[in-house]
Amino acid sequence: MPTKLERAEQNVETRSESLKKPLGLFDLVLTQILFVVGSSWVGAAAKLGQAHLFFWLLAILLFYIPQAAVVIYLSNRMPLEGGIYQWAKLGFNEFAGFIVAWNLWLLSITVIALGGMFITTNISYAIGPGAAWMPDSKWCVALISAALVGGLGWACVRGLSLGKWVHNIGAFAMFVVYAALIFLPLLGLARGELKTYQPLQLALPTMSIFYCFNIFSKLSVGALSGFEYVAILAGETRAPARDIGRSVLIASPVIALMFILGTSSVLAFVGNSPIDLIGPVPQTLRLGLQSFPIAGAVAAIGILLMTTRTIASTSVHVTGSSRLPMVAGWDRLLPNWFSRLHPRYKTPVNSIIFVGATTLLIAIASQIGAGIQEAFQLVDNAANVFYGIVYFTMFAIPIFGAGAIRSGASIWLRIVAICGAAVSLSAIFFTIYPIIDVPSRLSFAVKIIAVTGIANAIGVAIFLVGRKRRRG
């Protein structure tokens, strides 16, 4: 006789049978790399100087490896559509599953809403000084945001048979940029423009311990995160129990090398000069190729390729954030409207429309007035708290979860899960209590706590209403 856990898993698998399954191992690997690797973090890490390698290695040891290990374990144990929603629901209870999915959904909504602003900025950089007005133009940002959300929403409705190629092309564009970035110091050495280049030089940090922990938590939960997101699409993967874990194993070392060597390249050319934290990659490309007549053109191409990556990465957010309401609808915690599939493409079309409308409304509203802009900035700052909550819950499953799930977790997996949970808590703390200059640390902390509390109170209210409606 099947256990309660097995019946719950079978119910999700039965629901997932209606979904198309276009994702293979190749697609998953590229999506993992696309989603995790960004361009801004190599600039942030380069500000640490030669100590960047120390921080990268520490973050890899205490967060990146634990994250990969736990995601592999849970995706093998529960290869279910909805990913971490199902893991927390079956590992703890429905409330935990809903709240962790709610926090992840809030994070994605924030990222999608910001996408238009980032793309507008990148396009203005690619065009040159004549387009410097674009990021400051509310109408321009609003129009580009509308085009982004509309285009990605259409692709998402069409399904991952199309969407996976958006993600694959974005990953390829990023590979081209990072290959150029990593190769640049070698070219500089060959031409005599760089005297030395030591990409793997290990130096201990000289800044305060408090500052070190802050940077470490940011690199961990900010840069080296995202493996759990692809698992949301398990029901649309041909062999999820096998391939999601494999994709993490294959992508992990590639991602680590891209971050470490990319940071080394930025440091080699920018050095002690001010680092452009928005566009450290094009800044480095310009400096590395300044002796070539085509330096400006190459940098512009690099910016456009990174813009392609941003669009593709935002597409992953749209896809994942539309699946979370769908699976909550399966459990009748949200109206069944969110779970209805497109008759041809078998995608949650209503959920996609809801995500698109919500993010577009936020993106446009954030351009209207200073009060709304400040509120959105607070939500953006609180996004790290949302992600910290997601990761703390995920790491807790092999430690404190249901016996049927944690029974297969080895001692070493539980130890690394404890490390990951501790880092997640530190990321929450350093988001609430920043070491950067703010007018009032207490006021900043109170605002972040208030935003996080209100956001999660809304999530709790939605859960309670959904459960009451289901019982009635």
Predicted regions located by residue number:
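TM-loop-TM module centered on a large, flexible mid-protein loop between adjacent transmembrane helices
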Residues: 86-88, 93, 125-130, 247-315, ...
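Helix-loop-helix connectors at the membrane interface of multi-pass transporters/channels
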Residues: 4, 15, 86-89, 116-143, ...
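Membrane-interface "cap" regions at the ends of multi-pass membrane proteins
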Residues: 1-58, 64-69, 78-81, 460, ...
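Hydrophobic transmembrane alpha-helices that form the core helical bundles
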Residues: 46-48, 65-149, 154-157, 307-324, ...
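Select transmembrane alpha-helical segments in multipass membrane proteins
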Residues: 21-32, 93-106, 144-148, 206-220, ...
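Membrane-interface loop-to-helix entry segments
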Residues: 140-194, 225, 248-253, 384-393, ...
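A generic transmembrane alpha-helix motif of multi-pass inner-membrane proteins
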Residues: 56, 377, 382-387, 411-472
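Helix-loop-helix junctions that connect adjacent transmembrane segments
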Residues: 19, 53-54, 131-140, 168-300, ...
